[in-house]
UniProtKB/Swiss-Prot annotation:
Residues 1-63, 320-347 are annotated as: Disordered. This is CDK2-associated and cullin domain-containing protein 1. Residues 34-49 have a biased composition (Pro residues). It comes from Rattus norvegicus. The keyword Magnesium does not apply. SUPFAM superfamilies: Cullin repeat-like (SSF74788). Interacts with CDK2. Keywords: Cell cycle. Transmembrane segments: none annotated. InterPro entries: CACUL1, Cullin_N, Cullin_repeat-like_dom_sf. It comes from the Eukaryota.
Amino acid sequence: MEESMEEEEMLTYEAMMDDQNHNNWEAAVDSFRQPPPAPPLPPPPPPRPSSSIPDPGRELPGGQLLAVHAGSMDRKGLKEGLPMGSPPLSEPNGVIMMLKSCDAAAAVAKAAPAPTPSSTININTSTSKFLMNVITIEDYKSTYWPKLDGAIDQLLTQSPGDYIPISYEQIYSCVYKCVCQQHSEQMYSDLIKKITSHLERVSKELQASPPDLYIERFNIALGQYMGALQSIVPLFIYMNKFYIETKLNRDLKDDLIKLFTEHVAEKHIYSLMQWVQMAPTLFSKFIPNILPPAVESELSEYAAQDQKLQRELIQNGFTRGDQSRKRAGDELAYNSPSACASSRGYR
């Protein structure tokens, strides 16, 4: 009987020690999970002497359990007084700390200085700077196109070898900005109108020329215009690259040469016909359909005339080009008698 009592006492003591270790382990884990504890609460009231059973509303530390077991509890009280089941819930220190941290954050937000309007001013300033770079259609017509118009006038009316006091860099910059601001279509239209107006004026001047000066003035007008294109086309190369070639599938130089053909050459070709009758051999070198149709019996004479023309051109500085690039079939066709007849097909 005594042995069974001793065994029961030992089992009860081990259970109490397990509860103590379990409580200490949970407290250690909570100390790592939760923020620092709140200020210490006032000490609990002393235990009532009439009862040795702990208050179930609060959890006794492990040390108090040991003290109760060692001093004031007998074996029966130890068996009956220890609470069974899960330990009571601890005080919600995490919720209290969360509320206090929220209050502290609110206090810091109130104490922080109010944002100054400098950031808003900087944003507005950068936006205004960006808007200042925008070229409206009014800006194009009042500022940019007048510069281009004046430069085109000087280029179209210059004489060979004359110095033109214009800034090519400034003109190219104007074209670049207008293309970037989506004014390519308007600028191309203005350029075509400008050059068309100039060519119409040249055509009227040629019509008013006396017959003996007509050919000479026509040659001067053609040379002056082709020389102007050598400067105008490079100035508008950005518009040509990103508008004419991509959207119109054409080339600026071809368009400007076509303008001269339509407004000057085609209008005055018939004025040259009376001169053609005076020297048909001369004009047949440059104008087709001047000579009568070729005759087979005169093929050798046609070949001799072609060879003579080639010699004259070489003497005057004209070259036949790189003959090594000619295909063998073309060379045979050129040396055959039929080639001479075909070369006179425009007679």
